[in-house]
Every structure is written in structure tokens, then in C-alpha cells.
Amino acid sequence: WTLDARLTHIGSEGYIDRGATDLKSYMFQAGYYNGNTMLKLISFGGKAKTGLTYTGATKEEMRLNGRRFHTEGMYYTSNGPHSYYYMKDGERQRATVDYYDDQTDNYLQINNQLVLSHRFNEKWTLNATGFYTYGYGYYKQYKDDAELAEYVNLDTEIQEADLIREKIMRNHLGGLNASAAYSVRKLDLAFGGSYSYYSCPHWGVLDWVDGLEGSQIGGRWYDNDVDKHDANLFARANWSVAKGLRLFADLQYRYVSYQAWGVNDNYVSEEVGMQPIDVDKQYHFFNPRAGVSYTLAERNNFYLSFAVAQKEPTRSDFTDRYMFAEANTYPSSEKLYDWELGYQYTAPRLSLGVNLYYMKYKDQLVPTGMV
């Protein structure tokens, strides 16, 4: 038996104003070893709290207010304890401001793994890992003179007001990876599979709106959920055909099911309200890889390979398409064809290598630059 544990705490005030960090983490591991069997229980995680500094500052704001200045959580008040300097009609002006003291990003994550490895004999080995990850996070923001039309549950005719909002997410990820390996003479085989399930609801609430009572604020101003099932099967072979000559091949089948529903945190218009989300897509991927390598005089290795890789769109690919695509259309999955040719020279005190490759993409998902 073996036991290991560790606790860590890191804190910093940060260089940027109100950019402090408070990071706590832990690790625990228990292991059992008995001949050809190993069993491990591993748990690690942490909690982070950091000040929001996303907005940055213009060159003029930094010149007038210092390099550490930013406007996150800032609001104007007649008796504020802080000064904000700006230019108007060529003259430097001063305003009194204060800062919301809980303008923070908060996240908790806990990872658990159960790992099994067993060697049946000289030819067969088995490896399996079960895992579960839990996460919960939110950030709080003070918004000065926010447009209230974007918060659709408010019962008011007021168009702008100061408010405090929270954006929240909770995620669950669980699954199993398993593989077996077989080795005999000049042939090495491996095969296995994995399955994972991911769930991640997102929602937002208003903690306070200037001038409104609690009953006027309403419930969640956006609320959406995501379910993702990801499964794959694979087989891999390495065959030493002759001295210095090796053939290798991989085959993978992957299935992805992705559902998302609800409303996103993007305000579209008075008619539509918040951006609707309605995604139900399934993907079937076959990813082969094959190649050959030849070692000459021990120090020279030549190789040639071909591979296919495919990837489903991300959550942001699905949500962003609403602004640019017709209804009920979805982004395509990416596909990559990769050819590689290479040479490597290895000596006790010197290693040299050259790699030529050609990658052909189909339906590649790339940033457009639009904001």
C-alpha cells in the first residue's frame, strides 16, 4: 500500500488593481500493489478566487490614472473615495468613483480517478480508468448604467440602471477508459475504447438592480444546458517485418452526440429577446492512421505516414452560428488529411531530424475576426 497527500495555497495581490488571487488545492492518492496488479484511487482539485481585470484600459486612461488602472467594478458616486481622471475639451477632468468589492471570478473543481492495471502473463496486459469530475463556478459583476432591455425578466419601464449580476455554471464529467495489449514475437497489438458523459448548465441571475425591489427583478435572465456523449473504439498494431523495417496502423471509430437547449446570454432584439439555443447533432468519425519506418545502421531512421483526424464543433461554434447562419443550420465537423515524411539521425551527442508534412483540411472551423 502507498498513501500520498498534499495541500497547497497560493495568494497574490496582483499587479493590476483589484487583481488579487486566492488559490487552494489538494491531492490525495492511495495505491495497492500485488504482484501483477496495481489499483490506485486518485483525487485532486482546487478552488480559485481571482479579481476580474478583463476590461483593461486605453492608453489615455493609463496615462491619466496609472498603468495598473482598469474600469472593472467602477461606478460614479458623488462622495466616492477614489478619483478617475479623463480628458474633456482638452482639459483634464476629475470624477469621484468607487469600486464594487466583490468583482470576482470563482471556480471549484474536484477530479476523481480509479486506475486499474493488471498483467495476466508475458503477452497480455489490461488497463482501465474510471473518472468523475465536478465543477462549479461563477463570476460577479457590477455594471454601471446597464441597458435593462437585455435582462428580459425585469418588471420595469426604466431603460438604464446600475446592477450586480452573476453568471454561473455547473459541470459534470464522468466516464471510463479501457484498453488491452497483446505482444508476441514481432507483433504488438492494442485495442480498447472509452465513454464519457458531460453535462454543463449555464445560467445568470441579478443580485441587485438600482431602484427596483426584489419582486421586480425576476428569476434567471438566461438559462441553458448541454449534454454530450462521447464514445470510441480503437485498434493499433505494430509489426516488425524484418530487421529495421516496421509497419504500424491505427483504426478508431468515434461517436459524438451533442444536445444543447435553452437561451444564451446574448441579447438579440426586443422581438427575439435572449438568443435561443436548440442543438441536437450526432457525429460518426472513422480515423485511420498507417505508416512505415525503416532504421538503417541503428542511427538513421526514415518514416512515412498518413492519417485522418476529425473533430466536432465546439459549444461556441454552435452558439455563434445563430448570429451568422440561417435557422436550423449547423457548422460542419472538421476533417484533416495528414501526410508526413521524415528522417532522424541519432548519435550519443547529436540528434538531427527533418519532417516534411502536408495537411489538407475540409470544413475547417476558424475565427472570422468579427466582434
Write out the residue ranges for each language-model feature.
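Residue-level signature of outer-membrane beta-barrel architecture
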Residues: 1, 31-34, 118, 181-184, ...
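Transmembrane beta-barrel wall of Gram-negative outer-membrane proteins
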Residues: 1-11, 17-53, 112-122
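Extracellular loop and loop/strand-boundary signature of outer-membrane beta-barrel proteins
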Residues: 12-16, 23-25, 97-102, 111-115, ...
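Flexible, surface-exposed loop regions and adjacent strand-edge segments
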Residues: 21-25, 56-66, 71, 142-153, ...
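Acidic/polar loop-and-plug regions of large Gram-negative outer-membrane beta-barrel proteins
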Residues: 38-113, 141-163
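Face-selective signature of the C-terminal outer-membrane beta-barrel domain
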Residues: 106-268, 293-295, 353-354
